[in-house]
């Protein structure tokens, strides 16, 4: 009988689930907007992922399930709960062993993680006191541009210049962006300024400055 293993990242903004077979191949993955109740978020995502795998009827039939993320303690049927910081480190170590630093731009915080040669966490820092620089900040900027987050993420690629965003607060930054749009400034250059301001915040906050190269950005 085939064996299947699952992981559920119950994040503050999105919930992600993945199922692997016994060879390590991904056989199902789901990403859904998180609900206010993390138990329901995890259950909905797991149910959808399980439905994609022939022979599986419920998440409790998985041979092993790990819960991680903001709501990791609420993942139903989880055999183990592991912090997202440790999961990031080991996952990146397996996928790209040369990478020694990660920036995780989450829904409500930004984490910088330094990884040891065996995939364990050397050090990390986290900014969870300000919305500026988080995934929710990007979402608010996309709304200000009246486009989807996916459309917004590609907009700056067409920029020839960068218009700096000087506000350090998410609320003031949104007002500044709306003013720049009203002045007729190129939207792609404003978007580039937004993304540059977030990148600067990540580097300024992080404790992994001695291991920046090579690094991966995750969002």
Language model segments and positions:
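Short glycine-rich, Thr/Ser-proximal phosphate-binding strand/loop in the N-terminal lobe
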Residues: 4-44, 48, 124, 128-129
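Phosphate/pyrophosphate-binding loops at sites that engage ATP/ADP/AMP, CoA/4′-phosphopantetheine
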Residues: 46-63, 202-213
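Gly/Thr-rich phosphate-binding beta-strand-loop-beta motif of the actin/hexokinase/Hsp70
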Residues: 1-23, 100-119
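Glycine-rich phosphate-binding loops at beta-strand->alpha-helix junctions
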Residues: 70, 211-219
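Glycine-rich phosphate-binding loop plus the immediately following alpha-helix
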Residues: 37-38, 117-161
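Adenine-nucleotide phosphate-binding core of ATP-dependent small-molecule kinases
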Residues: 175-207
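Short acidic, glycine/serine/threonine-rich loops at helix termini
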Residues: 18-20, 74-79, 112-118, 124-126, ...
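Short beta-strand-loop/turn "lid" adjacent to the catalytic site in phosphate-handling enzymes
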Residues: 30-34, 53-86, 113-114, 122
